[in-house]
């Protein structure tokens, strides 16, 4: 009987830790920087980089953005518009922090878009930010803008 209770307790502990991980993904914090879903009506202090690219299944492409001025927020908006395809985004900051992977359902909606705000009251790290876009589940070729 006590062995069964131990197994049940272990299963509940694992399930609880999974729930905590899922909730913490919405506010990934590192070096004071917070990554969170953006409200479509919000704006940031720096205009989003707008470049186009495309990916296929299991292909990785890279984009960059240079932050040279002091800012406390930055918007990253990966848009492909086809919710039947799934892209994955990782963000690499100049201070070595890695955020992600982030998927389309990050904000609770599957809409062919990953729209994030990068926030840091002390200032977003200056330098080159790298965006890794990966074709997680793509039929054919999927175009995107970021």
Residue ranges and their predicted role:
Residues 88-146:
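Noncatalytic accessory or regulatory domains flanking protease catalytic cores in secreted, cell-surface
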Residues 1-2, 62, 117-118:
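A generic local structural motif
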Residues 10, 17-20, 39, 54, ...:
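Intrinsic disorder/low-complexity segments
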Residues 1-30, 131:
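Secretory targeting signatures
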Residues 6-9, 53, 112, 135:
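Small side chains
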Residues 54-105, 126:
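Acidic, Ser/Thr/Pro-rich low-complexity intrinsically disordered segments
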Residues 24-73:
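Non-catalytic extracellular/lumenal accessory regions of secreted precursors
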